[in-house]
């Protein structure tokens, strides 16, 4: 609600538009919250603002100046957490901890407090000014640190020279119960918040943990520098990596079992940086893997084209897009629909993200010479019906894949290109002859992922910029025939306004008209123009349809797709 607070106060005639603008200038100048800026500029009294917030959030309001919080209560919340989330614990009530917050809708803060304290969290609202004053007052002498929560792991763990490191001590610290508890907290919190990646990042004077949620990075924690090596070592031990090797990148995998028997995999990448090892973990939740093609977000005609292309006994189907655009999900859904007792499927992947019964999956190992090209050559002696190559990276892999597609095999793979027509140019630039490209390709699919508007709180847009719609590519005659929605923010979406992502597809069957253009040396722009004439919807066109259907916003479409220019 923070972004709309000023507008709500104006609407309730508690402040004027001029006062809001003055406060916004103060906010931009000093980086404070809008509520604090309004109080500082004299637009509204602190007590009136707190009462207003209480009504908006539906929670009681308190004046922290009237409270004398017991030290035992203060110790429950580390100073770092109090300052990060602007919270102050005020009392206990049975299994619940009552916490004063200036933004009770901050689900991240509530979750962190619940994890760290073990209490159910009941929120009350207080102004930011009073919370900052309370933090300064209660934590002035010696506030509790996060180390008090996770325990002391020993001063000798932090070292300055690699040659003096004690590996036995590092391993021991990594297995200490407090460190194990903190690492488990990070992993479980990422699962609960539906993160796709966890970043554990060391810097010269700082150490932070960030989650990527719906494609956007969010900071969630700043553990003490003292625990940096212990946390990294714990993650490396869980991933069966060598904790004594800190100069080279390492890759591994973590598998954990949660309540109810559910298992979760984490793909782990460790990379040495200037101030220590950075750990990135990709969450691999097979239960959330969508393998039903009809539920991936295809429109009816593109879905029919895609199904027809993968149902052919031979030829090549390519899925393109940047990292994190959902290519693996699309390929896995295709393999799932093709997997049967009468089919031999071989895949070369780097890495293998999910295991599938009935599919022969091979993990690449470049260090011993097992790359995509080597795996492909081996597959051709394995009597395959369908071959999936994780990525076409070079001429050798492309050449073998094309030849396999021309000799009775269905080949599925990915490339990193901006759109479907651009994939043809990439293959030609790799050195594949035009006649081989036209003879082997069945279909090219380009895709992106845009954030989906939260269905629980999205609302019709009050002000629609018609010129912005036209500039984005919406036909003028379509303006006013659909309802545009805008993000709001609620507990369901952690006050972000978005929840999950929606796929945007550009499906280009390799029609005869396109083959003729390729043979004649046409450019990617000419290919795209002809494909659209033949019925293809570009990424921008598909994205705008998702917007007109109310699934996402114009900002997401424009940010994830390029305009169609010929």
From Swiss-Prot:
One of its GO terms (cellular component) is cytoplasm. ATPase component of the type IV pilus (T4P) that plays a role in surface and host cell adhesion, colonization, biofilm maturation, virulence, and twitching, a form of surface-associated motility facilitated by cycles of extension, adhesion, and retraction of T4P fibers. Acts as a molecular motor to provide the energy that is required for biogenesis of the pilus and the extrusion of substrates generated in the cytoplasm. PilB ATPase activity is also essential for T4P extension while antagonist PilT ATPase activity is required for T4P retraction. PROSITE patterns: T2SP_E (PS00662). InterPro entries: AAA+_ATPase, ATPase_typ4_pilus-assembl_PilB, P-loop_NTPase, T2SS/T4SS_dom, T2SS_E_N_sf, T2SS_GspE_N. It is found in: Cytoplasm. ATP binds at residues 321-328. This is Type IV pilus assembly ATPase PilB. GO terms for molecular function: ATP binding; ATP hydrolysis activity; metal ion binding. Keywords: ATP-binding, Cytoplasm, Metal-binding, Nucleotide-binding, Zinc. Belongs to the GSP E family. The ATP-binding site is essential for assembly of pili. The keyword Ubl conjugation does not apply. SUPFAM superfamilies: EspE N-terminal domain-like (SSF160246), P-loop containing nucleoside triphosphate hydrolases (SSF52540). CDD domains: PulE-GspE-like. Homohexamer. Interacts with PilC. Interacts with PilM. Zn(2+) binds at residues 454, 457, 490, 493. Disruption phenotype: Deletion mutants show complete loss of T4P-dependent motility since they did not assemble T4P. PilB and PilT double mutant also lack T4P-dependent motility. Changing residue 391 to A: Strongly reduced ATPase activity. GO terms for biological process: pilus assembly.
């Amino acid at each position: 609600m923070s972004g709309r607070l000023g507008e709500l106060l104006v609407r309730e005639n508690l402040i004027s538009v001029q006062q809001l603008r003055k406060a916004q200038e103060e906010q931009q100048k000093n980086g404070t919250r809008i509520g604090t800026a309004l109080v500082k500029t004299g637009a509204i009294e602190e007590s009136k603002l707190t009462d207003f917030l209480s009504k908006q959030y539906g929670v009681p309001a308190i004046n922290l100046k009237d409270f004398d919080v017991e030290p035992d209560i203060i110790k429950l919340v580390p100073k770092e957490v109090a300052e990060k989330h602007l919270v102050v614990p005020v009392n206990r009530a049975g299994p619940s901890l009552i916490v004063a917050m200036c933004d009770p809708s901050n689900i991240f803060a509530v979750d962190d407090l619940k994890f760290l304290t073990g209490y159910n969290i009941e929120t009350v609202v207080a102004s930011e000014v009073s919370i900052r004053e309370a933090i300064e007052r209660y934590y002035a002498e010696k506030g509790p640190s996060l180390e008090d929560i996770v325990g002391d792991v020993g001063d000798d763990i932090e070292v300055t020279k690699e040659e003096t490191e004690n590996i036995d001590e590092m391993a021991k610290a990594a297995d200490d119960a407090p460190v194990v508890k903190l690492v488990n907290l990070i992993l479980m919190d990422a699962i609960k918040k539906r993160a796709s990646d966890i970043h554990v990042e060391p810097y010269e004077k700082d150490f932070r943990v960030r989650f990527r949620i719906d494609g956007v990075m969010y900071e969630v924690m700043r553990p003490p520098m003292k625990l940096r090596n212990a946390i990294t070592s714990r993650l490396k031990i869980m991933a069966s990596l060598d904790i004594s090797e800190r100069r080279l990148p390492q890759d591994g995998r973590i598998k954990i079992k949660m309540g109810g028997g559910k298992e979760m995999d984490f793909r782990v990448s460790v990379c040495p940086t200037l101030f220590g090892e950075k750990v990135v973990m990709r969450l691999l939740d097979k239960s959330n893997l969508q393998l039903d093609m009809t539920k991936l977000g295809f429109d009816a005609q593109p879905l029919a084209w895609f199904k027809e292309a993968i149902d052919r006994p031979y030829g090549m189907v390519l899925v393109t897009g940047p990292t994190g655009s959902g290519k693996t999900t699309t390929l896995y859904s295709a393999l799932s629909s093709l997997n049967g007792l009468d089919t031999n499927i071989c895949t070369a992947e780097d890495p293998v993200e999910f295991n599938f019964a009935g599919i022969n999956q091979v993990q690449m190992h470049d260090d011993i010479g097992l790359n995509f090209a080597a795996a492909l050559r081996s597959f051709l002696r394995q009597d395959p019906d369908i071959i999936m190559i994780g990525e076409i990276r070079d001429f050798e892999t492309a050449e073998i894949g094309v030849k396999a597609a021309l000799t009775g095999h269905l080949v599925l793979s990915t490339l990193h290109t901006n759109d479907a027509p651009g994939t043809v140019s990439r293959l030609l630039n790799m050195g594949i002859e035009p006649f081989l490209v036209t003879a082997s390709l069945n279909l090219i699919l380009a895709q992106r992922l845009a954030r989906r508007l939260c269905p629980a709180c999205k609302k019709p847009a009050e002000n629609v910029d018609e010129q912005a719609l036209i500039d984005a590519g919406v036909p003028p005659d379509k303006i006013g025939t659909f309802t545009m929605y805008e993000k709001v923010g609620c507990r369901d979406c952690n006050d972000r306004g978005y929840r999950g992502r929606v796929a945007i597809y550009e499906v280009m069957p390799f029609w005869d008209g396109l083959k003729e253009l390729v043979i004649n040396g046409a450019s990617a722009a000419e290919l795209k123009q002809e494909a659209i004439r033949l019925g293809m919807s570009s990424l921008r066109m598909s994205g705008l349809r998702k917007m007109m259907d109310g699934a996402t916003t114009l900002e997401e479409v424009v940010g994830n797709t390029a305009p169609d220019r010929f």
